[in-house]
């Protein structure tokens, strides 16, 4: 049986990973945020179809980069977890981009993989008080998102 000390040593996040996470100079799929914990970063992630890389970038306002109708004002903002963020897809392939093409107007994607309901809600409140606020909001909640609001360290659960 594994001891408590061995478990902690095995499940603790390594210093190098934390250094990249806290650095604004390193590309990372997640960037530190003092209020939310983290937000979407800029990275090439090897999680696409057949081992391909997904290109994930974020705009200055923290939204995932979009291609459709960027010059137009936005009436719809989306918030939530990895489904909202569209993990495992590249910029321009998100469901928000497909819906934007159908509606003929931009849709901002403020989703972040791993977010709990409260994190997504806090991000919604923060963003909607800025010039990036929208007339219509989509707050996506699914499955275990509510548990994520009470778990202190998901890393220890994922990497036991």
Q: Model-found features: residue ranges?
A:
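Extracellular glycan-modifying ectodomains
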Residues: 1-160
């Amino acid at each position: 049986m594994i001891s408590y000390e061995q478990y902690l040593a095995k499940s603790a996040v390594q210093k190098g990973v934390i250094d990249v996470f806290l650095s604004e100079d390193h590309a990372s799929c997640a960037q530190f945020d003092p209020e939310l914990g983290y937000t979407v970063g800029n990275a090439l992630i090897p999680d696409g179809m057949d081992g391909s890389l997904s290109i994930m970038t974020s705009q200055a306002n923290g939204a995932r980069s979009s291609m459709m109708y960027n010059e137009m004002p936005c009436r719809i903002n989306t918030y939530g977890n990895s489904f909202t963020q569209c993990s495992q897809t590249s910029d321009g392939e998100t469901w928000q981009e497909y819906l934007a093409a159908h509606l003929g107007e931009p849709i901002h994607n403020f989703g972040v993989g791993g977010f709990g309901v409260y994190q997504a809600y806090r991000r919604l409140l923060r963003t909607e008080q800025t010039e990036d606020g929208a007339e219509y909001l989509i707050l996506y909640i699914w499955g275990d998102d509510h548990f994520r609001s009470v778990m202190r360290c998901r890393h220890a659960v994922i990497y036991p």
